[in-house]
């Protein structure tokens, strides 16, 4: 009897969220343009990120808005991730992965994303994209009622598992560096 090994459905990885951040470093007109751009790219209303402390050399005060970010989940996250990966040529450095299954990479100019055009009124912005991968059942540790501990073997997503997930689902090539 040849037994076929089945994969436990609770061990399969899934895309939890994609977080897109544009750090401007100052409040004002440029921050408003970044807000408008991020809203056009994602179709979701961004939130302002706030400076944690004062840095006099950069002219940043604690509590001042210095950037914008958006968190995408579900289908919107997958669609946006496909567009953004096309901008980087479906290649991600191995050093972009951490030991918890998170991946981060940057885009130098937003005009590299397919389907976007240069608008002289907005200008050009770079952005950071962070991908978070989890296993099913992780909500048990985060919910308000009846929280429960999740063992480390199920909680953590290894670097290799995250690389394999992106290779299979998004045709990503991992580049050493």
Swiss-Prot record:
The keyword Protein transport does not apply. GO terms for molecular function: rRNA binding; structural constituent of ribosome; tRNA binding. The keyword tRNA-binding applies. One of its GO terms (cellular component) is ribosome. Keywords: Ribonucleoprotein, Ribosomal protein, RNA-binding, rRNA-binding, tRNA-binding. GO terms for biological process: translation. Pfam families: Ribosomal_L5, Ribosomal_L5_C. SUPFAM superfamilies: RL5-like. InterPro entries: Ribosomal_uL5, Ribosomal_uL5_arc, Ribosomal_uL5_C, Ribosomal_uL5_CS, Ribosomal_uL5_dom_sf, Ribosomal_uL5_N. This is one of the proteins that bind and probably mediate the attachment of the 5S RNA into the large ribosomal subunit, where it forms part of the central protuberance. In the 70S ribosome it contacts protein S13 of the 30S subunit (bridge B1b), connecting the 2 subunits; this bridge is implicated in subunit movement. May contact the P site tRNA; the 5S rRNA and some of its associated proteins might help stabilize positioning of ribosome-bound tRNAs. Part of the 50S ribosomal subunit; contacts the 5S rRNA and probably tRNA. Forms a bridge to the 30S subunit in the 70S ribosome. Belongs to the universal ribosomal protein uL5 family. This is Large ribosomal subunit protein uL5. The gene is rpl5.
């Amino acid at each position: 009897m040849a037994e076929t090994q089945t994969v436990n459905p609770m061990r399969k990885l899934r895309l939890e969220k994609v977080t897109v951040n544009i750090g401007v470093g100052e409040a004002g007109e440029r921050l408003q343009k970044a807000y408008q751009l991020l809203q056009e790219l994602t179709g979701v209303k961004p939130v302002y990120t706030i400076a944690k402390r004062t840095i006099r050399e950069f002219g940043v005060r604690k509590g001042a808005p210095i950037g914008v970010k958006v968190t995408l989940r579900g289908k919107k996250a997958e669609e946006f991730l496909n567009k953004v990966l096309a901008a980087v040529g479906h290649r991600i450095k191995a050093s972009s992965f951490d030991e918890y299954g998170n991946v981060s990479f940057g885009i130098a100019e937003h005009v590299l994303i397919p389907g976007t055009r240069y608008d002289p009124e907005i200008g050009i912005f770079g952005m950071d994209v962070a991908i978070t991968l989890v296993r099913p059942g992780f909500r048990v540790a985060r919910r308000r009622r009846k929280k429960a501990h999740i063992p480390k073997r199920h909680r953590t997503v290894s670097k290799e598992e995250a690389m394999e997930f992106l290779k299979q689902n998004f045709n990503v090539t991992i580049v050493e560096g």
